[in-house]
From Swiss-Prot:
Residues 10-188 form the Ku domain. The gene is ku. This is Non-homologous end joining protein Ku. GO terms for biological process: DNA recombination; double-strand break repair via nonhomologous end joining. Residues 284-299 have a biased composition (Basic residues). Homodimer. Interacts with LigD. GO terms for molecular function: double-stranded DNA binding. Belongs to the prokaryotic Ku family. It comes from the Bacteria. Pfam families: Ku. With LigD forms a non-homologous end joining (NHEJ) DNA repair enzyme, which repairs dsDNA breaks with reduced fidelity. Binds linear dsDNA with 5'- and 3'- overhangs but not closed circular dsDNA nor ssDNA. Recruits and stimulates the ligase activity of LigD.
Length: 299
């Protein structure tokens, strides 16, 4: 089963349904990494000052909102955090509407809702009620410190929550400035009949197994072919990147090592001084680490 990305409850009236949120989509797109063609080293990203062209360190970057042309209002991290909505771990239903009333352009990201063992019956009750009434539930939910408008709807035996775009983020059709040739088209009966006949001839069932991303398939086939021919470039990863990825483990190991060292030194101080001197004479001097010779890369 897919990993839950959020746990909480659906809430409407006095009803609470414990649920977990599972992503209903996955990305299979080709991931192209940037490489320096001269050395096949990975190419990263830098924060560049657009005026001076120089790199800017993270501690010198602040966040600003454009207020007027070339004029910004700067907000601190504390001010930004204070604007985040309080996470309630609930999907708060505030209305039930006909699904046809939700414009297609408002639909954004779907998620599956899986019930907790304690709430399976009431989960099924909400699903069946939505089916019987042909309604969807509108709700507010906070995910990753952001408040979202959402629609909860039935899908076969499950419930789905679809994140909706805020109406202010969706453009009206008036922005297209359609002419009367489109809005009040004068179509003849024969034109309509031929179009309907064409649609009828091309009508088919939804067959998801037959719909493929041909670009993805061709790229991966090309990768497999070139790999089979031995056309593979060795890329040296940045050791600093690996250190950052394992930072938590390194920090924990360092803490444990220092804790053990602290205990060891404390126990040594309790031993007689004479024994300490004998131990110092018997222990060999630490060897200096060997210096590695650097080999230049061919450009």
């Amino acid at each position: 089963m897919a990993r839950a990305i959020w746990k909480g409850a659906i809430s409407f009236g006095l009803v609470h349904i414990p649920v977990a949120l599972v992503s209903a989509t996955t990305s299979n797109s080709v991931d192209f990494d940037w490489l320096d063609k001269r050395s096949m080293d990975p190419v990263g990203y830098k924060r560049i000052n657009k005026v001076t062209g120089k790199e800017v360190t993270k501690e010198n970057i602040v966040k600003g909102v454009l207020h007027e042309k070339d004029r910004y209002v700067v907000l601190s991290e504390e001010e930004i955090r204070s604007a985040h909505p309080k996470s309630t771990q609930t999907i708060d239903i505030f209305a039930f509407v006909d699904s046809q009333q939700i414009p297609l352009q408002n639909i954004d990201t779907p998620y599956f809702l899986t019930p907790d063992k304690r709430g399976e019956k009431v989960y099924a009750l909400l699903r069946e009620t939505l089916v019987d009434t042909q309604k969807v539930a509108l709700a507010n939910v906070v995910l990753h410190t952001r408040e979202h408008l959402a629609a909860v709807m039935p899908l076969e035996s499950a419930l789905v929550m679809v994140i909706l775009r805020w109406p202010a983020d969706v453009r009206e059709l008036d922005a297209l400035e359609l002419t009367e040739a489109v809005t009040d088209a004068r179509l003849t009966k024969s034109e309509r009949d031929m179009a309907r006949r064409l649609v009828k001839d091309m009508s088919a069932d939804w067959q998801p197994d037959q719909y493929h991303d041909t670009f993805q398939e061709k790229i991966m086939q090309l990768v497999q072919t070139k790999a089979g021919e031995g056309k593979i470039e060795d890329v040296e990863t940045d050791p600093g990147e690996e250190e950052r990825k394992s930072a938590d483990v390194i920090d924990l190991t360092d803490l444990l090592r220092r804790s053990l060292a602290g205990k060891s030194s404390a126990s040594k101080t309790r031993k007689p001084a004479a024994k300490d001197k004998v131990a110092d004479k018997q222990s060999p001097k630490p060897k200096r680490p060997a210096v590695r010779k650097k080999t230049g890369k061919a450009s």
